[in-house]
Amino acid sequence: MNRFQLLSKGLRLIHKMSEEALAGVPLVHISPEGIFKYVMINVIDGGDASKAVIRGFADCTWHADIFEREEEVFKKLGLRAECPGGGRIEHNPDKKYLKVYGYSQGFGKADHAQTKRILATKYPDYTIEISDEGY
């Protein structure tokens, strides 16, 4: 094998590994209950593949805290992350209810309709409401 073939084979292997890493990223990771900030994150592998995920944690004061925490996780997997926006989530597991609303002052408003679709993959038996009202 010449250098070009070795390089090409190595790049294909790296790309396959990043595709597998992307496939392993959960679509939803949010706090089990309460009202908290959330961000939508576009997770991107080394090529053109990407997926939008939802992250929201009650222990994070700022939307940027959530993004920075998750960005580090994705970097360790060889993935990039971009944040198109955020908002708030009200999570009531007893009532099987989620409400998505508001916006992030730093990142802007996430697409709440898309957020609802993503949340429904993890919470198919929940009532999920979206609103553009409130902060």
Swiss-Prot record:
Substrate binds at K37, S104, Q105, G106. One of its GO terms (biological process) is cell differentiation. The active site is at H63. GO terms for molecular function: protein histidine phosphatase activity. InterPro entries: Janus, Janus_sf. Disulfide bonds: none annotated. JanA and janB regulate somatic sex differentiation. Keywords: Differentiation, Sexual differentiation. Coiled coil: none annotated. Belongs to the janus family. This is Sex-regulated protein janus-A. It comes from the Eukaryota.
